[in-house]
C-alpha cells in the first residue's frame, strides 16, 4: 500500500497549527504498520535553514496554471526514513507567512497541480493521495476531471481530511477557468460552486473517494447547519463516505519523562516532580510562588472559536477564587487586550503571554494543574491530548474531539480523565471550573484523576490502524 500525503504544512518543516502536528506525526505511525508513505509540501521561505540544507534537488519542470506555465522545482529530504518532497517556486512560496496572502487561491492551485504533475517524475505512483484541508482539496477535483483518463493516474484514489471546516478556500468564479482550466459544467452544486464563487473545500468533498474528519463527534456535528459552515448539505449527502478518526499526538515527543523543556521530568508514578514544574513556571512568569494555588493553563489562539467570550465574561468571578491563570497565544485584538489588562490588574495571579513560544508552551502543559478549553467548536483539539499526557487535567466543553477524548471524572467510580460541561454558557463553564478546583486540595482524589489523565491513550497507534483499514477498503 503506497500513500502520499499532500498538505500545506508539517512539523518540523512548517507549522501554523494542529495540521502541522498531524502531518508531522501520523505518517510515521502508518509506516510502522507497513504503509509505504511519503509527504509532499510547499518549500516555504520559513522552513528552518538546517533542514533546507539537507534537501536534494531532483529536477525542475514547468506546471500549467491556467494559460500560464510556472517554474516548479522538486526537492527531496529523507526524514526519519520517510521521503518528504518539496515543491519549490520562489514567487509563490518565498515570502513571509504560509497563508493570508491575496493570491492564496493561485498559490495553492499551483501546488495542487504540481502534486499531480510531478508524480511520474519522482518514480512514485501512490495507491492513494491523502489530501488535507482546502489548500490541497482541489487535487481531487483535478485528478477526477483532468488526469484520471491518463494511464499513469487511472487507479489512484483520494482521501480528503477536514481539519477545520470553517476555513474553506472560497475564491471568485473566474479561478475555475483561469487557474484550473476547469469546465463550467463543474460550477454547480455537485461540483465546486458556492454562492457564486469557487469553494476549494467543496471540490475536495465532491470529488474525493472518501472523506474523513478528525473526530467522530465532529463528523456528526458538521452535518448540522450550526457546525456545517454552509456545507452541511454536501456532507449529509456524502455521509456514507464520511468517517471521523480521532487525531493523536506523537507521544514520543510529548513525553513528561524525557521532555527537555520541563523544569523537572516526571511520570504518573512520580507526581512529586510535577509540583516543581509548577513552581518553576510561577517563578518564570513572576506569579506568586505557591504550590497550593490551583493553576489553570491555556495555550490557544485568542479567537471566538476557542471560547474566549466565556472566559472574558467570567474573569472577575474567577479571580474571586483562589486560582492562577496562565495564557499563551495570539489572536484577535479584543481578546489580547482583555487578557493584557487582566494581567496588569492581577499581576501575581494572571500571566498573559501574547506570542507563541514552544518551550513556554511545554512548561505550561507540564506545570499547570488544569487545562481550559471551553471551545465553541473543536474539530479534534490537540491541546487536551497534550495536557492528558502531562497530567494537566482538562476542563472542556463537550464538542467535537473534546467530547470524544475527555470523560467527566466520577468521584464514586473513580473513572474519567477531566471535567466537562455541555452548553456554551459562561456560568456552566464557571461552575465546572469550581467543581474541578474543589477536588484539588484532596491530593489523594486529585492525583487519581491526574493518573487517569496520564494513562489515557493519546498516541496515533489506534487511529493509524483505522486509516490503514480505510485505505485498504478503497482497494
Swiss-Prot record:
Belongs to the glycosyltransferase 1 family. Bacterial/plant glycogen synthase subfamily. Transmembrane segments: none annotated. It comes from Alkaliphilus metalliredigens (strain QYMF). CDD domains: GT5_Glycogen_synthase_DULL1-like. The gene is glgA. It catalyses: [(1->4)-alpha-D-glucosyl](n) + ADP-alpha-D-glucose = [(1->4)-alpha-D-glucosyl](n+1) + ADP + H(+). This is Glycogen synthase. GO terms for molecular function: alpha-1,4-glucan glucosyltransferase (ADP-glucose donor) activity; alpha-1,4-glucan glucosyltransferase (UDP-glucose donor) activity. The keyword Disulfide bond does not apply. It is an enzyme of class 2 (transferase).
Amino acid at each position: 500500500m503506497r500513500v502520499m500525503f499532500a498538505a500545506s504544512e508539517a512539523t518540523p518543516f512548517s507549522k501554523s497549527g494542529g495540521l502541522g502536528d498531524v502531518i508531522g506525526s501520523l505518517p510515521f505511525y502508518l509506516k510502522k504498520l507497513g504503509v509505504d508513505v511519503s509527504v509532499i509540501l510547499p518549500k516555504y521561505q520559513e522552513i528552518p535553514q538546517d533542514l533546507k540544507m539537507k534537501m536534494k534537488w531532483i529536477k525542475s519542470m514547468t506546471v500549467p496554471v491556467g494559460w500560464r506555465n510556472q517554474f516548479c522545482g522538486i526537492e527531496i529530504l529523507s526524514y526519519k526514513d520517510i521521503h518528504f518532497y518539496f515543491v519549490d517556486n520562489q514567487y509563490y512560496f518565498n515570502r513571509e507567512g504560509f497563508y493570508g496572502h491575496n493570491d492564496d487561491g493561485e498559490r495553492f492551485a499551483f501546488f495542487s497541480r504540481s502534486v499531480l504533475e510531478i508524480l511520474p517524475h519522482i518514480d512514485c505512483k501512490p495507491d492513494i493521495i491523502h489530501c488535507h484541508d482546502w489548500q490541497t482539496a482541489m487535487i481531487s477535483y483535478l485528478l477526477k476531471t483532468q488526469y484520471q483518463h491518463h494511464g499513469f493516474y487511472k487507479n489512484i484514489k483520494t482521501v480528503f481530511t477536514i481539519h477545520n471546516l470553517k476555513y474553506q478556500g472560497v475564491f471568485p468564479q473566474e479561478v475555475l477557468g483561469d487557474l484550473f482550466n476547469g469546465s463550467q459544467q463543474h460550477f454547480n452544486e455537485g461540483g465546486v460552486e458556492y454562492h457564486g464563487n469557487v469553494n476549494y473545500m467543496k471540490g475536495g468533498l465532491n470529488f474525493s473517494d472518501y472523506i474523513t474528519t478528525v473526530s467522530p463527534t465532529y463528523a456528526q456535528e458538521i452535518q448540522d447547519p450550526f457546525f456545517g459552515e454552509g456545507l452541511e448539505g454536501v456532507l449529509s449527502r456524502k455521509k456514507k463516505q464520511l468517517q471521523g478518526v480521532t487525531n493523536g499526538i506523537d507521544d514520543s515527543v510529548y513525553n513528561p519523562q524525557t521532555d527537555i523543556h520541563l523544569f523537572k521530568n516526571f511520570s504518573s508514578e512520580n507526581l512529586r516532580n510535577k509540583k516543581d514544574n509548577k513552581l518553576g513556571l510561577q517563578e518564570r512568569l513572576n506569579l506568586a510562588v505557591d504550590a497550593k494555588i490551583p493553576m489553570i493553563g491555556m495555550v490557544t489562539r485568542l479567537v471566538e472559536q476557542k471560547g474566549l467570550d466565556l472566559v472574558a465574561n467570567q474573569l472577575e468571578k474567577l479571580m474571586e477564587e483562589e486560582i492562577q491563570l496562565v495564557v499563551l497565544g495570539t489572536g484577535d485584538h479584543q481578546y489580547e487586550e482583555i487578557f493584557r489588562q487582566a494581567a496588569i490588574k492581577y499581576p501575581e495571579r494572571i500571566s498573559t503571554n501574547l506570542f507563541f513560544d514552544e518551550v513556554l508552551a511545554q512548561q505550561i502543559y507540564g506545570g499547570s494543574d488544569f487545562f481550559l478549553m471551553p471551545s465553541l467548536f473543536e474539530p479534534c483539539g490537540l491541546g487536551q491530548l497534550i495536557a492528558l499526557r502531562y497530567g494537566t487535567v482538562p476542563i472542556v466543553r463537550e464538542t467535537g474531539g473534546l467530547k470524544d477524548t475527555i470523560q467527566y471524572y466520577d468521584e464514586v467510580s473513580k473513572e474519567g480523565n477531566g471535567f466537562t460541561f455541555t452548553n456554551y454558557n459562561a456560568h456552566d463553564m464557571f461552575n465546572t471550573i469550581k467543581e474541578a478546583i474543589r477536588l484539588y486540595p484532596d491530593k489523594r482524589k486529585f492525583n487519581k484523576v491526574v493518573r487517569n489523565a496520564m494513562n489515557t491513550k493519546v498516541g496515533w497507534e489506534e487511529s493509524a490502524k483505522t486509516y490503514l483499514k480505510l485505505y485498504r477498503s478503497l482497494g
